[in-house]
């Protein structure tokens, strides 16, 4: 699967704080326990490039820059070029922005990475937010339910030449069958059995997510909200691979 080319640990920890000091502390503590870090829109809006660079220096881990770009193609291409100096390993857009927008994002990432002499990011698209269920989606005017929409948008993403999608692990098995082993599946909404579900409705455990075909697991509060984040990350690793992590 594509994940093996990035890191042996499939867990990217979602550092969902706007405080740079807290984020850098978490990144440093988790350096040996996770495969990467995810920074999102709220952190980026508050702290910009400087804050992202500080966290990346502290953690020395691959970066998933979760900004979910969604605008006209030229604007998205410009936004992608603007964040490329941060050298993200993963960068995402909204699939519902359409094929032309996704192509523009991919081409901008590739050309700017070449100009900067860095590896281009894996470009992925958001299908349906994991906070949404069938009723929520129907309220936006989309018929057919979450899975139908996820499959449509994932196919569109592949046709635009992107590397994969963000999806719930509950859709991963179907998407793996639809789109093959070389299509990256990044799954938020993953919670170990000992954690609460918080605000995400389509939730599975880490072990279940991997069994369903996920490549990257995005896990936030079960790790970052724990008394000992490093221990929590090790417990999750133990759930995934079924080994005794010595805790």
From Swiss-Prot:
Keywords: Decarboxylase, Lyase, Pyrimidine biosynthesis. The active site is at residue 68. Coiled coil: none annotated. Substrate binds at residues 16, 38, 66-75, 130, 191, 200, 220-221. GO terms for molecular function: orotidine-5'-phosphate decarboxylase activity. The keyword Repeat does not apply. It comes from Rhodospirillum rubrum (strain ATCC 11170 / ATH 1.1.1 / DSM 467 / LMG 4362 / NCIMB 8255 / S1). Catalyzes the decarboxylation of orotidine 5'-monophosphate (OMP) to uridine 5'-monophosphate (UMP). It catalyses: orotidine 5'-phosphate + H(+) = UMP + CO2. It comes from the Bacteria. Its EC number is 4.1.1.23. Pathway: Pyrimidine metabolism; UMP biosynthesis via de novo pathway; UMP from orotate: step 2/2. This is Orotidine 5'-phosphate decarboxylase. Signal peptide: none annotated. The lineage of its organism: Bacteria, Pseudomonadati, Pseudomonadota, Alphaproteobacteria, Rhodospirillales. GO terms for biological process: 'de novo' pyrimidine nucleobase biosynthetic process; 'de novo' UMP biosynthetic process. Disulfide bonds: none annotated. Gene3D superfamilies: Aldolase class I. One of its GO terms (cellular component) is cytosol.
């Amino acid at each position: 699967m594509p994940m093996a080319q990035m890191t042996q640990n499939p867990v990217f920890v979602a550092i969902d704080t706007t405080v740079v000091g807290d984020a850098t502390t978490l990144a440093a503590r988790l350096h040996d326990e996770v495969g990467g870090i995810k920074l999102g829109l709220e952190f980026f809006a508050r702290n910009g490039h400087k804050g992202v660079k500080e966290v990346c220096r502290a953690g020395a881990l691959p970066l998933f820059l979760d900004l979910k770009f969604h605008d006209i193609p030229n604007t998205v291409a410009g936004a992608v070029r603007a964040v490329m100096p941060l050298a993200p390993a993963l960068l995402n857009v909204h699939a519902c922005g359409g094929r032309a927008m996704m192509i523009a994002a991919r081409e901008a990432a590739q050309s700017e990475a070449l100009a900067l002499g860095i590896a281009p990011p894996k470009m992925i698209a958001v299908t349906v937010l994991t906070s949404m269920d069938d009723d929520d989606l129907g309220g936006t005017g989309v018929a057919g339910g979450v899975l139908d929409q996820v499959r449509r948008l994932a196919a569109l993403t592949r046709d635009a030449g992107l590397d994969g999608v963000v999806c719930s692990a509950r859709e991963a098995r179907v998407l793996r069958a639809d789109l093959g082993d070389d299509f990256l599946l990044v799954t938020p909404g993953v919670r170990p059995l000992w954690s609460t579900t918080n605000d995400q409705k389509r939730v599975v455990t880490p072990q279940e997510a991997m069994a369903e075909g996920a490549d990257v697991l995005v896990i936030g509060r079960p790790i970052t909200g724990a008394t000992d984040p490093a221990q929590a990350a090790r417990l999750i690793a133990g759930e995934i691979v079924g080994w005794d992590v010595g805790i």
